[in-house]
């Protein structure tokens, strides 16, 4: 396992999802894919939610492909990896920074990506998860939720980098990555069987409307 997390380009992300599911019926090696029961929808914080089950923030919710894998495994409430003003080698601590007595997917610092990189990655994941939900009939594309997570002190949260991250996920419509992802999908409609231009244009720019504050970090 490599010790540096490298985001996947959006076109590669989408093509990997389409090719793998159509040939193997899996998504990023998740074979036991969960299809939601559409009769058991609920509402949380003003948005639809097919299941209250999901994943907490961690290295498994930092890269877009891992977020898609979480959704494929049944997660419908996804707490995105915590963002802070310091990241990577700037933290000055060894990896991994969390004890794993048995085994775990944890080879990262408490923040591997810069706030802007994290925002871009989560927006790519937002589009990709919407697409796999619709294209493969895994559930209602409007019934899963992303939850922002920031820390670890007020001074860091108020910095321009983290503030821009918060604003970008609250309304991504003017971000470059949102526009690029949307345009890529519109330009490649031939790749899809169940996704059309109307669906792509309906994908909301308000990625997150809830937030988790991470205030304790040991």
Placement of each model-derived feature along the sequence:
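Surface-exposed cleft-lining segments at the edges of enzyme active sites
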Residues: 201-213
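Conserved, mostly hydrophobic/aromatic
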Residues: 55
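Conserved, well-structured core domains of diverse proteins
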Residues: 1-37, 71-76, 80-200, 204
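Short, acidic/polar
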Residues: 62-69
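N-terminal alpha-helical transmembrane segments of multi-pass membrane transport
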Residues: 44-45
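Conserved small/polar residues in nucleotide/adenosyl-binding loops
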Residues: 216-218
């Amino acid at each position: 396992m490599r010790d540096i997390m490298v985001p996947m380009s959006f076109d590669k992300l989408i093509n990997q999802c389409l090719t793998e599911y159509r040939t193997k019926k899996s998504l990023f090696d998740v074979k036991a894919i969960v299809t939601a029961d559409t009769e058991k929808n609920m509402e949380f914080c003003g948005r639809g939610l097919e299941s209250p089950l999901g994943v907490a923030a961690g290295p498994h919710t930092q890269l877009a492909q891992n977020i898609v894998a979480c959704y494929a495994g049944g997660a419908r409430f996804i707490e995105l990896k915590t963002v802070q003003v310091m990241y990577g080698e700037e933290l000055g601590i060894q990896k991994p920074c969390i004890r794993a007595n048995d085994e775990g997917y944890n080879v990262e610092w408490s923040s591997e990506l810069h706030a802007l990189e994290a925002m871009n990655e989560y927006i790519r994941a937002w589009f990709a998860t919407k697409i796999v939900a619709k294209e493969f009939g895994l559930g209602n594309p409007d019934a899963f939720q992303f939850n922002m997570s920031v820390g670890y002190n007020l001074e860091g949260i108020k910095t321009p980098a983290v503030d821009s991250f918060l604003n970008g996920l609250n309304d991504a419509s003017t971000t470059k990555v949102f526009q690029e992802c949307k345009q890529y999908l519109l330009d490649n409609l031939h790749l899809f069987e169940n996704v059309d231009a109307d669906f792509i244009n309906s994908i909301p720019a308000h990625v997150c409307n809830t937030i988790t504050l991470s205030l304790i970090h040991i």
